[in-house]
Amino acid sequence: MGHYFMLNLLKKLPFYEKTWFQFILFVLRRFEADRCREHAGALTYTTLFAVVPMLTVFLVIISSIKALEPARQQLQQLIYSNFLPKSTIAFDRVLNSFTEKSSNLTVIGILFLFVTTVMMLSTIETAFNRIWRVKETRSGIIGFMRYWTIISLGPIILGSAFVISSTVASMNILSNNFAGYELSGAFILWLISFGLTILGFFILYWTIPNRTVPMYAAIIAACFSAAIFELLKNIFGFAMSNFTSYELVYGAFAAIPIFLLWIFLSWNIVLLGVEVSYALTAFHSDKIQTRHPVLMLLDVLELFYKKQKLGQSVTDLEALDIMGRGEIGRWPSYIELLEKQNLIKRTDKDEYVLVRNLSQVDFWTFFTALPYPLPLRKDVGNIHPDDEWMQKIGPALIEADDYLAAKLSIPLSTLFEAK
């Protein structure tokens, strides 16, 4: 009841049909449909066990590079200031006490921390893949090398960027005039740290999902998440600093529930950014009709058929382009159905090709292997204007519907009466 009331209320807004508002609704609907809040809760639980190992591995890699060793404390403080809210609870001191004790571990201990970090990244990948409707994760040596690259190069890139920014900050150029405006050194450093936050989100959105994510989508989603994250951090920090009654209730344990709440909110932002990156690749169609699944699959096969004639493959973006807004969520399931019938194959470039001669596949054989009913007369009329192939199959479907309606129009009582 509440859902329909809210929907009717939104439809009364003068900008309801605007593309930008429909895009926002699309993202929010998918956020709820994908149960992102539940996934954020699961990731919060995982993060609780993995945050210290990840920070420790990060600091070990930084310390192993002499050029970055002087910036370790500053870089550590940068991480805390960017990813933890300001409040009366010293989150950084609590985490420092754990990481300092963990930094004296043996090789076996460090290996354990590395495995824990890899498991954390694997959990993140699973959550991202669910949003992208990808059922398979990268396994084996490819998955391991990708995780190793993120773990090893991530700290080095951030550390190098911080060293460069510190060098620039030590110069006098940060307080000079630029285009007639007086530049603030603190503001420049904030921009640098904000840029590093964007870089972190970009690496997540671009590299973690097991599919090709367009760079522009990852960049825009990273900027969106970084802005929301910065806003939430300030609001959260202000609330925690001015409403301290929770400390009277929890006492010395006040940091635990607050830290869990912050992690939960942070993961919601991260997953919302994933939804934005997906929406940027999917929400580009002005077609609003949701067609019968069998008709949708025929439209997809037509795309593959035309591409095969040209000796080309089909990308996700090309397939999504022929779908309506209510159909794009079914694309992964359509791919799975076509693969089961050995009609298409996935290439090493995450694209798809038609691998069978469609002249040897009849419609009835294709249809009976699908988990969908036969399209009826009403379904034949609900198509897109460019579905020209419907001119051939449409009359046959209408004739089949009329035939079945005539043959099966039997009173139910007749079925149950004795002879």
Swiss-Prot record:
It holds the Pfam family Virul_fac_BrkB. It comes from the Bacteria. The keyword Cell membrane applies. The chain crosses the membrane at residues 42-62, 105-125, 148-168, 186-206, 212-232, 252-272. GO terms for cellular component: plasma membrane. Keywords: Cell inner membrane, Cell membrane, Membrane, Transmembrane, Transmembrane helix. InterPro entries: UPF0761_bac, Virul_fac_BrkB. PANTHER family: INNER MEMBRANE PROTEIN YHJD (PTHR30213), UPF0761 MEMBRANE PROTEIN YIHY (PTHR30213:SF0). This is UPF0761 membrane protein ACIAD3168. It comes from Acinetobacter baylyi (strain ATCC 33305 / BD413 / ADP1).
